[in-house]
A protein has these predicted regions:
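A short beta-strand element within beta-rich, extracytoplasmic domains
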Residues: 1-7
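Short coil-to-beta strand junction motifs in C2/discoidin
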Residues: 7-13
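Conserved hydrophobic ligand-interaction patch in extracellular adhesion modules
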Residues: 32-35
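Low-complexity, serine/threonine/proline-enriched polar segments
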Residues: 37-138
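Predominantly extracellular/luminal cell-surface or secreted proteins
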Residues: 16-20
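Ser/Thr/Pro-rich, low-complexity mucin-like regions
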Residues: 138-197
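Eukaryotic short linear interaction motifs
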Residues: 8, 23-25, 41-43, 176-178
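Acidic, glycine-anchored loop motifs typical of Ca2+
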Residues: 21-30, 48, 52
Length: 197
């Protein structure tokens, strides 16, 4: 999975995979999480849900609330090219997403004053971890992270033992924003099977 991460900017995404078990060519079978370095840690929320609310007008932040009692806003920053952060294809006044949430790893470098979105050790898309396939990527160009389907787990954490995968999805793993940079959101630039035969 290619993202645009570099040493001071990781926006991790959790990778989910599916086998087309029923053979109908649709992603309607079981999704399996590819576990990463934060899997099973107490600060990782495995049953996270966040609801986003339509803003009252263009250029406004998007309010959110979650199933942990948290609430906040996705800021509308001047560098956004679109009028709304809220998806325009969703007609409802709110929508809810379900997934896994990692603890934010954002901090200010005291020596430079720069905001750093720190990396997690391994196992996430758009993350500057030990499993990246390319060098330092100082300019934030496309850079690969390698994944192994042997890391696919059932909901109870046991190995899924998948033989192959037919579908892949990536879920932003952080619910965090900074005033300067905006929301931490995973960028996926490409996907490829590196073991295709």
């Amino acid at each position: 999975v290619s993202g645009n991460m570099f040493a001071s900017s990781s926006e991790p995404g959790i990778v989910w995979v599916m086998q087309d078990t029923n053979g109908n060519g649709l992603p309607d079978d079981e999704w399996y999480q590819l576990k990463g370095s934060e899997y099973g840690k107490p600060q990782t929320v495995e049953d996270y849900a966040v609801t986003y609310y339509r803003p009252s007008g263009a250029g406004m932040p998007v309010r959110w609330s979650d199933n942990r009692g948290g609430e906040g806003e996705v800021p509308y920053n001047n560098f956004h090219r679109q009028e709304f952060n809220y998806p325009q294809w969703i007609e409802a006044q709110s929508y809810t997403l379900y997934g896994v949430r990692l603890a934010p790893n954002t901090y200010t470098d005291t020596s430079t004053g720069n905001i750093i979105n720190g990396a997690y050790e391994w196992g996430y898309a758009d993350n500057y971890g030990s499993d990246r396939a390319t060098g330092d990527n100082a300019d934030g160009a496309a850079a690969k992270t390698l994944f192994d389907i042997d890391n696919a787990v059932n909901a109870d954490g046991t190995p899924a033992n998948l033989q192959y995968i037919d579908f892949v999805k990536v879920q932003t793993a952080i619910n965090h924003a900074t005033a300067l940079l905006g929301e931490v959101s995973t960028e996926v630039l490409a996907m490829a099977d590196e073991t295709l035969r």
